[in-house]
Structure formats: C-alpha cells, structure tokens
Amino acid sequence: NSIGTYTIRYLNRPLAYYKDHLLINLERARWQYKSEKGSKYVIGNIAAFMLQAFNEEVDSILEMRICCGSVRNKTPLLYSKIYYMELNPYWNVPQNIIRKEIIPSYRRDTTYFTRNRMKVYDKNGNRVNPHDIKWAKYTAGVPFTVKQDNKEGNSLGRIIFRFPNPYAVYLHDTPSRWAFNRSNRAVSHGCVRLERALDFAFFLLEKPDELLEDRIRIAMDIAPKS
C-alpha cells in the first residue's frame, strides 16, 4: 500500500500524542472488557474494522471484517451484553437520519419512499401518505416515524443482534456488500455491519443443531444445507 495524506499526518504527530493515547486506551481496556467467566464474548476493533468472537475457553474462533461509523457518525465505544437476535427486522429510521437524509432525498425524488419500501406514520401510529406532508417546514423535530419494510434491500439486512446501550447502535447484516472490499470501512451511521452475519448467529447460539441452522437460513432466504 502507498503512503497517503492520512499516514503522513499521523507520522508527523509528536510522540507525546501517542503516549497519551496509549495510556488512555490501556485504562479504558482495564474496565471495559470484562467477560464473565466461562462465557462467550466479542470484541469489535473499530480502528482495524475487524470483529473477533471468542468461546468459553478464550479461543478466537471467528473473525470477520466489519463496517463502522463514518467520521460524522462515529461508532461509540461501549460494553454490553447481546440479548437476542431478530430475523428479517424492520428498520425504524432514527430521527436525525429522517431529517438530514431522507427528507432532502424525498424533496429531490418523490419516489424515494416507494423505491426504498419505506412507510410513514404519525405519532398515533396511523399510516400517512408522504405526499400529503409539508416536509420543508420540519427543520428541527419531525412528528412522524419512518419504517422500512423487512424485505430485500432493508438497511439492516436479514438479521440484527440487539444489546442494551444508550446510543441506539447494534450489530447487523447489510445489503451493501461492496463496503467490505474497502480498506477504510467507516461508512455507517454508527452501527456495526457484519461481513458474516449468519456465521455470527451460529456462534451465539448455545448448541445449534442442523435443523435450527437450516430454519435460520431459510428465514434469511439462504439455501438450507440439509
């Protein structure tokens, strides 16, 4: 690989800069990565755009590329527990994405909601025709919710892994496979996209049998093995 602008910029920083960052990260690692004895755990390396999954014996048994948040939408550092996975999830679009991306896209192309299989609802949960809304007047808050159907092309892909956190970020599949071929994979809104979401699902299951694995594959429109 050739040396680019970013590499030169970081090489020109003083040694004290890296020393301070090392001390900060060592302290962070000391309190952040605390797995329960005898339990599986996962580490997402944001800087390397990689994820490692470890079994109860602390053996790394799964490794894959990931996509993380962009410079404007950084993936937060956190520690949590994965509680459940959801197949073919709907995407409830965050308010900031509605305001900053979806509304401008719709104003440029009024077929945006239809093409992306998105539906609009008012605060009472009633479906609203997006053509009847004066979107231009909503510059701060938007009194509507937008939900993307759980069909092919859904931004969350075919499966999502949910865990408690104050940032509304998760691990999930993605239809945007092209990003995994990039060296810089800072392309998301903050969530972590998994290169091999199906393998990750099998890792999390206690003792998956072939029947259960095939049921998951079928739900994700993947051909069963048996």
Where are these regions (language model features)?
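Well-ordered beta-sheet/strand-loop patches within structured domains
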Residues: 6-226
